Structure formats: C-alpha cells, structure tokens
C-alpha cells in the first residue's frame, strides 16, 4: 500500500492500478471518485463499499470485483457543497470562475470550472489575480483559506467562498495552544506522542513509496 495527498492522488492511483487487479482507495470516496474520473476510470469500474459496524454489509451483494473500491468516508466540510451552490453563485456573480477541492462531491466538481488540491486553489487564485484583474473567483473549500486568499489578493480580484464551510476541528488549533505546545517543546516538558513500534515499518514504507513514486 501507499499514502497520497489531494495533490498527488492522480499519480498514486495510476501507480496503484499497475500493482494488481484492483485498488482500495480510502478514506475519502469523493477524492477517489473525482480522481478516477480525471483518469478515465469509468463509473461501472468503481464501487463504493457499504460498511457497517461489523464490516462489509452483505458482501455477496456488493461488486467487490470492480477495479476501484472506494471506502465510504468523506470530508464533512467539502461534502456539504452541492451543485445548487454553484448555480446560485453563477447567477449572483455573472462571469465568475468557480473552483473547488476534489473532496467535494462529483456532481459539484462537474459544474465547476476547475478542481484541485489546496495548492491548486492557492495557485489558481494567484493566476486569476494576475491575469484577470477585477474578476470574481468562487472557491469551494474551508472558508479560512478562502478568506486568506481574499485578503492576499484584495484590490486585484474578488474571492468569495462557495458557501459557509468552517471546520470545527481546525478551529480548535488556536495561536495560544500552538504557543503553549512550542513553549513546552523548548522547555523539554512536552508530552510525547508514542506510536506502537510494530506500526512504524509499514507506515514508513507507505510514505516512502509515495515519495519515490512522486519523485520527491
């Protein structure tokens, strides 16, 4: 196995497809679906697993022989967007460009002008600001990033969130908490995070594979 990021999911899925008869992509089914679409993997070659508290639900009824098996997880922030959000923004801001993170639903990505990882969204905002001054860019991702991009390119273009999308877990990381942790590390008083030794080799291997495949 190997890990991937939203930025290199396409490269890693292509690699994984060459390693065997099928791939289990987890944990985000939307990133898996959108990556598969970009690579030309047809919908009939994919299957979103039905998982219950005891594992697979009625496995005999599931298409487990598909080329791509998708774990039914998602990012709660990105999954809340729907195609109507895009249509409403286009109606409110004629001529706007709409981009979104690939952890959004596939039907949302289908009606956007572009989709990509966080780094893609940042680069696209900079490109629009430089090449299309005065234009409007709608960005479908966690709102704090959108607000930072709007502030960074203020006076060049208008950058607006696709909808309300605040991650409560990210919001738990505050400047005060970060300072407290860094101060504890400097004072050698930080609470160590222990990982079971037997988990380290396979985890390291999956990360190393990603770096090697992506040429990093």
Residue ranges and their predicted role:
Residues 1-216:
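The feature marks the mature, well-folded catalytic cores of soluble enzymes
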